[in-house]
């Protein structure tokens, strides 16, 4: 049976519980253990698929089509363990299941209540489908004291009791603010956070204290005394220079050792952290720098592009260079000269998005890259905008539009109404529910012989993750190819365009999928590695 680690947070949100969970998973892996990571989100949405990126940040997509919290991206990048539908649960999903069962009569006339029915569903989620692993790490979203989080805290309290001593560890991430005017660190927020946690029946075993400066020994003793934990279990969590330094920093503070001690494991293998040390060294000592202009809609909250940012960093790691990102609001491009802000970049990337806002700015960015021979990477919506640009300015389809934002003109981009998943055909129509109705998850594609993407991937058949409900109309394929836009990747049935490229260009590729979701620091996605290599070449030409 696996052992369970429950990660909670207090004082404020955004303390890095997701990163802490991912780093702990990586440290346990470095000792030879198998891990699984899960996220429990207390919000009432069934999933984050219909939430604004400004509200929630990125919506992460798994191979099996789950629209999930961005923390699952951290989990995958740090551990390499693919996440699934079974690794993210929300209050909305739990209540939906319970109400469905109640309507069927499954509760045999009982009064359906938060305890035991909601808490039992949460416990079932935590314990089910764990697989053959040594540790399951469960992160509870939000902070202790949140009303919506109470059923989750009660469920893990019960699990701690039911699993028994030595099978469950509670780790609480908290804040130790440093008051500059007073010149001292304050422990009261942490004490009150732990007091709140203990009031609902959970005694933390370990405190991961986020702070700006080292914790004085006296404060460590004080925290341990008032929070009822060992002094060695008060772990310092200072900001790291790089995301990928976090496992090394936490190991240096003894976090993984303390976790194993709490489980009664004193004969664990020593960790092999050589891979993490190598990544840290590469990031700290880059051999050059490239600037990538990212023309997006949600640049006001960079968490909306979390996986993209990391995938570009992985491309930099693959080439031994630092990747500097220049964020450009696509809507601003519609008001000002779109070319001027891009003059100093070595590559242009247009990421995914939805809706009409900023469309013409993205199209202008694609035109700049095509005409100036600057490396261009269009992802999902970005590929569609590159196709519209080519249709308008190369193929003469001057009124080319997407039905996503216009009903007039030639629909070069249209609603995706039918596609194949395995041996089944999925269909959608106008008016269907918005949530969970896109083309989601991993789908195969076939690459054209002799194409740039075929060379980049080094194989003819690939599988990538999708999240879209609009698609390039394959009926325009011949007309666009005659003008130089090659359809170099198609679905196996040849119906859905997956990749386009321009042969007479140093590097111009658009993909309908999201390659950033499968990039890892130790295995940079080949498209991002190649894109940064092209940008590096461009930087040495100017």
UniProtKB/Swiss-Prot annotation:
Residues 298-541 form the Glutamine amidotransferase type-1 domain. It catalyses: UTP + L-glutamine + ATP + H2O = CTP + L-glutamate + ADP + phosphate + 2 H(+); L-glutamine + H2O = L-glutamate + NH4(+); UTP + NH4(+) + ATP = CTP + ADP + phosphate + 2 H(+). Coiled coil: none annotated. The active site is at 380 (nucleophile), 514, 516. Its EC number is 6.3.4.2. Keywords: ATP-binding, Glutamine amidotransferase, Ligase, Magnesium, Metal-binding, Nucleotide-binding, Pyrimidine biosynthesis. ATP binds at residues 14-19, 71, 238-240. UTP binds at residues 13, 186-191, 222. L-glutamine binds at residues 54, 353, 381-384, 404, 469. Residues 1-265 are annotated as: Amidoligase domain. Catalyzes the ATP-dependent amination of UTP to CTP with either L-glutamine or ammonia as the source of nitrogen. Regulates intracellular CTP levels through interactions with the four ribonucleotide triphosphates. This is CTP synthase.
């Amino acid at each position: 049976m696996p052992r369970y680690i429950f990660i909670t947070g207090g004082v404020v949100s955004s303390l890095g519980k997701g990163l802490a969970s991912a780093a702990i998973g990586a440290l346990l892996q470095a000792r030879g253990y198998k891990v699984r990571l899960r996220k429990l989100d207390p919000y009432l949405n069934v999933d984050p698929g219909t939430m604004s990126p400004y509200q929630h940040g990125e919506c992460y997509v798994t191979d099996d089509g789950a629209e999930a919290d961005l923390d699952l991206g951290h989990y995958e990048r740090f551990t390499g363990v693919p996440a699934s539908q079974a690794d993210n649960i929300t209050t909305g999903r739990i209540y939906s299941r319970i109400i469905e069962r109640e309507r069927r009569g499954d509760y045999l006339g009982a009064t359906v209540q938060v305890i035991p029915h909601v808490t039992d569903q949460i416990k079932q989620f935590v314990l089910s489908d764990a697989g053959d692993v040594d540790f399951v790490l469960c992160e509870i979203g939000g902070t202790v004291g949140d009303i919506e989080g109470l059923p989750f805290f009660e469920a893990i309290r019960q699990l701690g009791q039911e699993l028994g001593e030595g099978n469950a560890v509670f780790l609480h991430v908290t804040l130790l603010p440093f008051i500059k005017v007073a010149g001292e660190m304050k422990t009261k927020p942490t004490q009150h956070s732990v007091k709140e946690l203990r009031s609902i029946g959970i005694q933390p075993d370990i405190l991961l204290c986020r702070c700006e400066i080292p914790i004085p020994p006296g404060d460590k003793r004080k925290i341990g005394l008032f929070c009822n934990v060992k002094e060695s279990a008060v772990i310092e969590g200072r900001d790291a220079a790089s995301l990928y330094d976090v496992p090394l920093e936490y190991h240096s503070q003894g976090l993984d050792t303390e976790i194993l001690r709490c489980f009664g494991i004193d004969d664990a293998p020593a960790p092999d952290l050589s891979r993490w040390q190598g990544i840290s060294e590469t990031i700290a000592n880059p051999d050059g720098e490239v600037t990538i202009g990212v023309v997006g809609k949600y640049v006001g909250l960079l968490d909306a592009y979390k996986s993209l940012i990391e995938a570009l960093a992985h491309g930099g790691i693959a080439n031994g260079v630092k990747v500097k990102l220049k964020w450009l609001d696509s809507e601003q491009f519609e008001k000002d000269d779109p070319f001027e802000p891009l003059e100093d970049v070595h590559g242009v990337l247009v990421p995914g998005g939805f809706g009409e806002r900023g469309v013409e700015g993205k199209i202008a960015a694609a035109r700049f890259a095509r005409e100036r021979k600057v490396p261009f990477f269009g992802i999902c919506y970005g590929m569609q905008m590159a196709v519209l640009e080519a249709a308008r300015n190369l193929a003469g389809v001057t009124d080319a539009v997407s039905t996503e934002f216009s009903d007039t003109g030639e629909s070069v981009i249209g609603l995706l109404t039918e596609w194949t998943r395995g041996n089944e055909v999925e269909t959608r129509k106008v008016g269907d529910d918005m949530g969970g109705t896109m083309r989601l998850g991993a789908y195969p594609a076939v690459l054209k012989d002799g194409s740039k993407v075929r060379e980049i991937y080094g194989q003819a058949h690939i599988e990538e993750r999708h999240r879209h409900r609009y698609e390039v109309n394959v009926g325009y394929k011949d007309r666009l190819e005659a003008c130089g836009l090659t359809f170099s990747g198609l679905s196996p049935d040849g119906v859905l365009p997956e990749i386009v490229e321009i042969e007479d260009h140093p590097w111009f590729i658009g993909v309908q999928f999201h390659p950033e979701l499968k990039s890892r620091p130790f295995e940079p996605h080949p498209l991002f590695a190649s894109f940064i290599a092209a940008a590096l070449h461009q930087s040495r030409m100017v």
